[in-house]
C-alpha cells in the first residue's frame, strides 16, 4: 500500500473518532478505513470530543440522508473549530458528488475521499499532518478482501460482507 502506510511511529497515541452514515457498504468501507488507521498508530474512540482526527463517511441516497450527512459534518466541524480535533476527513457519497461545495462552504474539512478512494485514507492523513488539504477521488486501487485490516463496529455475532463497490440504491 505504499510508504505512507508505514510511517506510524509519530501517530502512536493519537485518537480517531468516526461517524458512519448510510448503507452496509458504507459501514464496511468505514471499518476498513478504521483498520488502516489503527494499523498506522491511531486508537479508535467512540467519544468524538477525545479525537485528534474525525472521519465522517457520508450518504446521499435520498434528500434526508444528504441532510443528515451535512448536519453531521457541521456538528463534527465544531470540534475542529473549538480546537478539540486537528483533522476532519469527509468520505463517501457526499464528498464524491459535492467536493467543490464542501471545501468552499465548510472550511474545517481537511480532506475529501470519494467512494472509490477509501483505501487512500492514509494519503489524506499524511496531507493533513503536513498542513495540506486534499481531495482524493480516484477509482479504487485495492479491492477489499479478508486480508485488509478491518475494525468491526457491529456486534461480535454479525458482520457485513461487501460483495460490490458503489451505491446500488441510486
Task: Show where each model-derived region lies.
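Proteins enriched for Cys/Gly/acidic motifs involved in redox and nucleic-acid/cofactor modification
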Residues: 7-170
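Short, small-residue-biased leader/transition segments that mark boundaries at the very start
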Residues: 1-5
Amino acid at each position: 500500500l505504499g510508504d505512507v502506510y508505514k510511517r506510524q511511529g509519530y501517530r502512536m497515541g493519537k485518537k480517531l473518532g468516526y461517524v458512519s452514515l448510510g448503507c452496509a457498504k458504507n459501514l464496511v468501507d468505514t471499518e476498513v478505513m478504521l483498520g488502516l488507521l489503527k494499523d498506522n498508530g491511531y486508537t479508535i474512540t467512540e467519544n468524538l470530543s477525545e479525537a485528534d482526527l474525525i472521519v465522517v463517511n457520508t450518504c446521499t441516497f435520498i434528500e434526508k440522508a444528504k441532510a443528515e450527512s451535512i448536519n453531521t459534518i457541521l456538528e463534527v466541524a465544531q470540534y475542529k473549530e473549538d480546537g478539540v480535533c486537528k483533522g476532519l476527513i469527509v468520505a463517501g457519497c457526499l464528498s464524491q458528488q459535492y467536493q467543490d461545495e464542501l471545501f468552499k462552504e465548510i472550511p474545517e474539512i481537511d480532506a475529501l475521499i470519494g467512494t472509490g478512494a477509501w483505501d487512500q485514507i492514509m494519503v489524506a492523513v499524511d496531507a493533513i499532518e503536513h498542513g495540506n488539504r486534499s481531495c482524493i477521488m480516484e477509482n479504487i486501487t485495492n479491492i477489499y478482501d479478508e486480508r485488509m485490516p478491518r475494525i468491526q463496529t457491529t456486534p461480535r455475532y454479525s458482520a457485513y460482507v461487501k460483495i460490490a463497490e458503489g451505491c446500488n440504491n441510486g
